[in-house]
Every structure is written in structure tokens, then in C-alpha cells.
UniProtKB/Swiss-Prot annotation:
Residues that span the membrane, as ranges: none
A family per Pfam: FBA_3
Domain F-box: 4-52
Native species: Arabidopsis thaliana
Protein name according to UniProt: Putative F-box protein At1g70970
NCBIfam families: F_box_assoc_1
InterPro entries attached to this UniProt entry: F-box-assoc_dom_typ3, F-box-assoc_interact_dom, F-box-like_dom_sf, F-box_dom
């Protein structure tokens, strides 16, 4: 009897180990065909194991805004009615989001493990967070939803209470140690006199297996500020560029997802971040990139090489270091097409994506190997006219929201 029980446990462990390496589409099928497998896959222990394994095979995520030409996907029909409070203007073209991802380090590049999800159009402006922990946060004015592009599962979140004239900015953070997501929302009610402007900071906590959640006000002990860049979450800390409302100085704000504490990170005097700056991961560290440095009108080196500088945050020394990067034969290989630096892969390859403001029917990504000096070009495989494309590294598969 004991041997039979031991053998059963061994078989279950083996099944769990095998399933933890399978693609999401296979697990979604297993959930349907077997109650036993569904119980394993939806268990918290397996979800955590699968997320850890997924981090070893990260994805490149493309967030494409384009004209909607197809009916909404069945899994996302609810989002259209969830956000749409006004009817579309007759004759107005509707814009949808397409989330397209591929394995960023697996050969053959850009054709391994393709996933796509189309989010239907709505009349209000929709903003999309940086992917973290396999999820993205969709915001349409005061409405929010979490979405898992890999499983095509979504969850509507409570509306935030804000003044009708408030400017609302949101970020998505994730704490790996506690397995908790938090949506950070900053609202500002604008007034001509700075002293009369009202700033509020609120957080929504989302835990696995917990259905109810609500917005809670928190205190920012640092200076009141207005966000100026997109956010990036790393190691349980959310970073975003901002400007102090008191002296208008640029700074970087960090938000500890677990403790919910803000910290203002001062910048060197020569570093003036604005809307054109973006956060990336450079060889494992947080870095700031000025996207205007990649304007094709900026003259490259006389030999045709591309030289640009980024500011890397040294976590140990707690300081910013200006880093010079040179790409040989850039003009010869790239010409006058706009490409922007998006960070490095786990294999330390530099990734450049076409400027989303000037994308055409075809959209390409460059990989530069710092050891072999090879510069390779890949097409993302999304056809049709695009309004904009946002490229994010290190997206992962996750079983959240299943």
C-alpha cells in the first residue's frame, strides 16, 4: 500500500515537472480535458513554479495600436462595453490594441512561440502599462482592467474615485516575494495657481485567489510630482521619471511595491529627463535612454558608426553613471530608419526597435551582439498599417487570472 502511494506521488511530481515546461496553449487545453490537471495547473504552487520557469524563457512584447478591421475576440468582447461610455462618432475609424509576443532569445528568432491578443476599440483614451509578471494593466480614464495576453484572461478592477477634471496616471507593479500586484494611481486636479493644485496617491492591491479589492489612499512623504515617463518595475520596485511641482526639477521616483513607500532619486545636473526619455534594463541594471538621440537627423560618426550615451543606475554605489555605446557600421546597415534602444537580453545582446512614431507596414527589430559585433534585423510579422508600436523586453508567460 505504501509503495502504491509513493509511486502515485512520484508520478504526480513527474507530471508537474513536465507541465511546468509546456507552453501556455497546452496548459489551457489540459485544464479543459482533465479536472485533475486543472486542479494542479490552477494551484498556487504550480503557478509560482511556472512563473519561475517562464522567467528563463522571456518574451519580446509588441503593443501595436492600429485600425480595427476585425470583430473583437470572444474573450475580450466584455472590455468594449466595459470602457465604452460614449458612442463612436459615425464614420470615425476605431483603433484597437494588438499584443504580439515572441520568445526573445530562442532560435529561430521571432517565430518561436508566437502569441497574439486583440483588445477591442473604445471611444476613450486607453493607456497600457509595462508588462510585469505576465500581466498588463489597461486604463481608460477611471476604469481599469488586468489582462493576461498569453491566456487571454482578463479581470475588471474597481473604478477609481477622482475629480472629473483630474489628470490620472497609473503604473503596474509586482512584488515577487509576496506574489502581489499593485496598481499605483496618481491624480492631479489642475489649477492655475500651483498652491491650489490637489495631488492624490492611491493603490489597488491584487492577490491571487482573492476576488475583492479596493482603492486605498496612501501618503507620499516625498515632494508632490507629476510623472513624465512610462514606468518600469524591477525587483519589487517601480521606477518612473517625474518633475517636482515645487521647483520643477526632474527626478526619478521609486515606489516599493511591498512597503508602498516613495523615494525620490536625484539626478545629475546634466541629466534633464522629459517625455522623450525611457527606462530600460541594461545588463541587469536600470538605465535611462534619451530617445531623441536616435533621430536620423543626428549625424553619426564620420566612419558611419552609431554612438549614443545612456545613464545607468549603479545600485551598489547609489549613483548614475554615463555609459558610452558604439555600434559599428550602423549607417551602412541601418541607413536613415529610426531605431531606438530598448535594452539588453539575458545574453547581453542590445535590442533596437523602430521608432513607433514613424512605423510603416513593416516593423523591424535589431539585435546587436557585443561579442561578435553582428547586427541582425528581424521582422515582427504583424501586417497592416500601424499607428504606433511599443516594444517591451522580458515579458513572461503566467497563469495569473486563470
Amino acid at each position: 500500500m505504501e509503495n502504491s502511494s509513493s509511486e502515485t506521488l512520484h508520478v504526480e511530481d513527474l507530471q508537474t515537472e513536465i507541465m511546468s515546461w509546456l507552453p501556455l496553449k497546452s496548459l489551457l487545453r489540459f485544464v479543459i480535458v482533465s479536472k485533475k490537471w486543472a486542479s494542479i495547473i490552477r494551484g498556487e504552487q504550480f503557478k509560482a513554479l511556472y512563473l519561475r520557469r517562464s522567467m528563463t524563457r522571456p518574451r519580446l512584447m509588441f503593443m501595436v495600436r492600429r485600425i480595427a478591421t476585425l470583430p473583437p475576440e470572444p474573450e475580450m468582447v466584455w472590455f468594449q462595453s466595459f470602457c465604452k461610455e460614449e458612442r463612436c462618432i459615425p464614420g470615425q475609424l476605431e483603433v484597437e490594441f494588438l499584443f504580439h509576443s515572441v520568445y526573445q532569445e530562442k532560435i529561430p528568432y521571432f517565430s518561436s512561440g508566437q502569441q497574439q491578443l486583440r483588445v477591442p476599440p473604445n471611444t476613450n483614451y486607453t493607456s497600457v502599462s509595462q508588462p510585469i509578471g505576465g500581466l498588463i494593466c489597461l486604463q481608460s480614464e477611471t476604469k481599469f482592467a488586468l489582462c493576461n495576453p498569453g491566456t487571454k484572461k482578463s479581470r475588471a478592477l474597481p473604478d477609481i474615485q477622482a475629480h472629473e477634471k483630474a489628470f490620472i496616471t497609473s503604473f503596474l507593479g509586482y512584488d515577487e516575494a509576496t506574489n502581489v500586484f499593485k496598481v499605483l494611481c496618481l491624480t492631479m486636479v489642475w489649477a492655475h495657481e500651483p498652491s491650489k493644485r490637489v495631488y492624490e496617491y492611491q493603490v489597488l492591491t491584487v492577490e491571487s485567489g482573492v476576488e475583492s479589492c479596493s482603492w486605498r489612499g496612501i501618503t507620499c512623504k516625498e515632494k508632490d510630482h507629476t510623472p513624465e515617463t512610462q514606468g518600469l518595475c524591477k525587483g519589487g520596485v517601480l521606477y518612473y521619471g517625474a518633475r517636482s511641482t515645487s521647483d520643477h526639477r526632474p527626478l526619478v521616483m521609486s515606489f516599493n511595491v511591498r512597503s508602498q513607500e516613495f523615494t525620490a532619486i536625484e539626478l545629475p545636473d546634466q541629466l534633464h529627463i522629459s517625455y522623450f526619455w525611457n527606462f530600460v534594463i541594461y545588463n541587469g541594471d536600470i538605465a535611462l535612454v534619451n530617445e531623441s538621440d536616435f533621430d536620423p537627423r543626428v549625424v553619426n560618426e564620420p566612419n558611419g558608426n552609431k554612438v549614443f550615451h545612456i545613464w545607468v543606475r549603479d545600485a551598489t554605489a547609489q549613483e548614475w553613471q554615463r555609459t558610452r555605446i558604439e555600434i559599428p557600421r550602423w549607417e551602412q546597415n541601418v541607413g536613415h530608419v529610426d531605431y531606438v534602444f530598448r535594452g539588453t537580453t539575458g545574453t547581453k545582446e542590445l535590442v533596437f526597435a523602430q521608432d513607433s512614431r514613424h512605423c510603416e507596414d513593416d516593423f523591424f527589430v535589431l539585435y546587436y551582439d557585443t561579442f561578435t559585433k553582428d547586427l541582425r534585423r528581424f521582422q515582427i510579422g504583424v501586417t497592416g498599417p500601424k499607428i504606433s508600436v511599443r516594444t517591451c523586453l522580458d515579458h513572461v508567460d503566467s497563469l495569473w487570472l486563470m
